[in-house]
Amino acid sequence: MTIAKMIDHTALKPDTTKEQILALTKEAREYGFASVCVNPTWVKLSAEQLAGAESVVCTVIGFPLGANTPEVKAFEVKDAIQNGAKEVDMVINIGALKDKDDELVERDIRAVVDAAKGKALVKVIIETCLLTDEEKVRACEIAVKAGTDFVKTSTGFSTGGATAEDIALMRKTVGPNIGVKASGGVRTKEDVEKMIEAGATRIGASAGVAIVSGEKPAKPDNY
């Protein structure tokens, strides 16, 4: 598999414009990225632009704080699928995890998994920068129990992004059959190679073109 096919080509800034989404989807077609990862408002346009392409549309759920209710997250998933999303990246209820309310964390994830079942792949963002190692392990274990397809490090909107150490811990926790996505601060081919070596099977990056072409990113982002 090429590096491009492991990358979710990402544009999640709040001020993203239509012109930028059109450029993102054009690049996805050209380079063969796994997906474009966009905010829900851009799902329909992105799906139209990628009709017939190998790249699919990924969107974010309960993003970036994860503090919506399970019911709201489930609705977001259904709406996104209706608009053409094939993958959804949800943020866990981080406060509930900190409170050791594992039942709520699981119910929250399961609401998304159930809403997406058979229609969209689910990635669970645990926001590693806010967690202890014990909490990272617990979050991954709960996500697997709830039926996720992937666990993912970061939103790119908090205090830190992906590290090889966190990827290795997540991979060790979920085993070989669940995907692990590194996201947040992955900007170069070298960054990607480190993450893959640590166990990542998907990369979230706004610098996708620079990564596959070897060029320097025009403007570094946190995701």
Swiss-Prot record:
UniProt keyword Ribonucleoprotein present: no
GO BP annotation list: 2-deoxyribose 1-phosphate catabolic process; carbohydrate catabolic process; deoxyribonucleotide catabolic process
Keywords: Cytoplasm, Lyase, Schiff base
Catalysed transformations (reactions): 2-deoxy-D-ribose 5-phosphate = D-glyceraldehyde 3-phosphate + acetaldehyde
Recorded coiled-coil stretches: none
Gene3D superfamilies per UniProt: Aldolase class I (3.20.20.70)
Location of the active site: 89 (proton donor/acceptor), 152 (schiff-base intermediate with acetaldehyde), 181 (proton donor/acceptor)
UniProt GO cellular component terms: cytoplasm
Primary localization class, coarse: cytoplasm
Stored SMART domains: DeoC
A Pfam family hit: DeoC
Matching InterPro entries: Aldolase_TIM, DeoC, DeoC/FbaB/LacD_aldolase, DeoC_typeI
The keyword Cytoplasm is assigned to this record: yes
Pathway(s) it belongs to: Carbohydrate degradation; 2-deoxy-D-ribose 1-phosphate degradation; D-glyceraldehyde 3-phosphate and acetaldehyde from 2-deoxy-alpha-D-ribose 1-phosphate: step 2/2
Function of the protein: Catalyzes a reversible aldol reaction between acetaldehyde and D-glyceraldehyde 3-phosphate to generate 2-deoxy-D-ribose 5-phosphate.
HAMAP family: DeoC_type1 (MF_00114)
NCBIfam families, per the entry: deoC
Family statement: Belongs to the DeoC/FbaB aldolase family. DeoC type 1 subfamily.
Protein name, UniProt field: Deoxyribose-phosphate aldolase
